Amino acid sequence: MSTSQLAKKGEAWSARFSEPMSDLVKRYTASVFFDKRLALFDIQGSLAHAAMLAKQGIIAEADRAEIERGMAQIKAEIEAGGFEWKLDLEDVHLNIEARLTALVGDAGKRLHTGRSRNDQVATDIRLWLRSEIDNIMVLLGALRAALLDLAEQNADTILPGFTHLQVAQPVTFGHHLLAYNEMFTRDAERMADCRKRVNRLPLGAAALAGTSYPIDREFVAQQLGFDGVCRNSLDAVSDRDFAIEFCAAAALVMTHVSRFSEELVLWMSPRVGFIDIADRFCTGSSIMPQKKNPDVPELARGKTGRVNGHLIGLLTLMKGQPLAYNKDNQEDKEPLFDTVDTVVDTLRIFADMVPGITVKPEAMRAAALQGYATATDLADYLVKKGLPFRDAHEAVAHAVRACDSRQCDLADLSVAELREVSGLGDKAALIGDDVHAVLTLEGSVAARDHIGGTAPAQVRAAIAEARKTLNG
């Protein structure tokens, strides 16, 4: 087979070889059926590159105009779903270039002057990922807003706070929800910080060493909205640390969603019954008619494992690669794409689901009345009366053990009984008639009246501050 015949096979590099690539290898190495989602960003980058080439006198202005005309038609075909993607053309870049050349002739062949697919794909990914980060930050904002609204509605609602899944102290449900707002706020900050490193232009690095053409990289960066250019051509084409950093931030987003999901599943359980989730976010059973299953939070837990796996996959992908570009890097896209899709879908669903959560304050309060949730308040009461904390801790532990045997709560004991079971001896008189005020749930949460505390007034203040941050 002649080299001219090989060139007709479609590979941009086929003139170098004496036999065509096997069909199996074509399928194995092709990326077009997943990287075609970069198409509009590929066009965007190519238009900026063409404008720079014309500005620098590397191609004629007439060629640039033809390239723009052809790209406009290709974009319309892609958006209409009429673009024909060909496996023989390997990837998104060569498919678009081949179509451009078919439309505008030699002008299309001149577009690739001064660049390589190595810096081209790195640019496409950064353009695409920058756009997706912006979208994720909007979705994080929507979820945070929904959590703040639900927290405000429940600033006075009391439920048991847990450590080790054992009743610890009373907290307000609003305070509990604000904890997740803090997590998602940090997630948004991490995304914004990650975006800074994504927003650097690789184009101009060419294959690995730069190009001999008199290009203007800063012009292209400005055209594409990048903050600047990648400063080393080898690094620009070969590293994917920006994608790894994004996946790490995304894994934390999903980890926080997963923690919230676990609590939603627990709270919705009939044995707990703190909340109900709207029917449109649940499924039933094909055999058990009574079932209402919290599939959305359960799936979010499961999908978190997949996103975490993508992070490890990308780290493993990069760990053994020498400089510069290697074909291994083609494997960066599918995990990155799936990570974005999973995070976007999850955040969109949760932002819609949270406002529809039905809170059951009576069930929460009943649970908070079990497990001696105000035991720490009794110890603090004794400390304020002058008892050392360790002695107070021991006295309350004696009282709790007595309540266990009597099957009652601390608040059910009279002052005389509290004195008797405390083991304080002549110091038992420190327990006065005012003791029961600190053993109420309302008294307990109201006492934590400081920044970061669970008191309703602090919860409302924290919500107001969080909204300023969100809207600022």
From Swiss-Prot:
Gene3D superfamilies: Fumarase/aspartase (C-terminal domain) (1.10.40.30), Fumarase/aspartase (Central domain) (1.20.200.10), Fumarase/aspartase (N-terminal domain) (1.10.275.10). Its EC number is 4.3.2.1. GO terms for molecular function: argininosuccinate lyase activity. The keyword Transcription regulation does not apply. Keywords: Amino-acid biosynthesis, Arginine biosynthesis, Cytoplasm, Lyase. GO terms for cellular component: cytosol. It catalyses: 2-(N(omega)-L-arginino)succinate = fumarate + L-arginine. One of its GO terms (biological process) is L-arginine biosynthetic process. It is found in: Cytoplasm. Pathway: Amino-acid biosynthesis; L-arginine biosynthesis; L-arginine from L-ornithine and carbamoyl phosphate: step 3/3. HAMAP family: Arg_succ_lyase. Belongs to the lyase 1 family. Argininosuccinate lyase subfamily. This is Argininosuccinate lyase.
